[in-house]
Amino acid sequence: PLSAQELLSCDTANKGCRGGYVNNALEYTVMRGLSTEECLPYKGTFDAKCSEMCVDSMKVRPDSFCVLFGDNDIKREIMKNGPVVSSMEVYTDFLSYKSGVYTKGEDVPKFSGFHTIKIVGWGVEDGSEEEPDKGHKYWIIENSWGEDWGLNGYAKVSEGQNLFFEQYAYSILTRKQSEEMKQSYERKQKAASDAQKPNDVPDMN
């Protein structure tokens, strides 16, 4: 595992346990790389010193990261490469979540702030065998509040609630993935350009 503590202690663009931004953490990871959990174990405190030994040691460094827009992009990325990271709006009723599929209360509970989570999968509850997709669709997220919270640290969150994280999820890319994405983009640009070219007009002479 990679060191979450390094992001808390060494990423000066964020504020450790007092909060920060996902893109700042990802930029640090791309620019500096991350040490292993063994080198810099998780202490869960912002006061833990940034270990120079680990900062200078061998790092795992991705090539880049990208933003995923919408349900299909998120699901496609999870299927192909694994979990993605995002931030979600948190309301007071989410703090006491225990089980089931979380849906924000109708009485509009108090907004508590934004919180970074990991999206690890999705599912459907109460769907029939004939129409399995007609049930209650949800995301499976991994939280950072310990195993005593929710479903051993995880939660099922209803799809389409506009809790922000479906709009701005992030994926980390290896060099190969970056090249594949670049080539795919260039192919699409060329196809779009070719489609806009006027058809050849035959010479009438």
Indicate where each model-derived feature is located:
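Catalytic-core signature of thiol
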Residues: 1-205
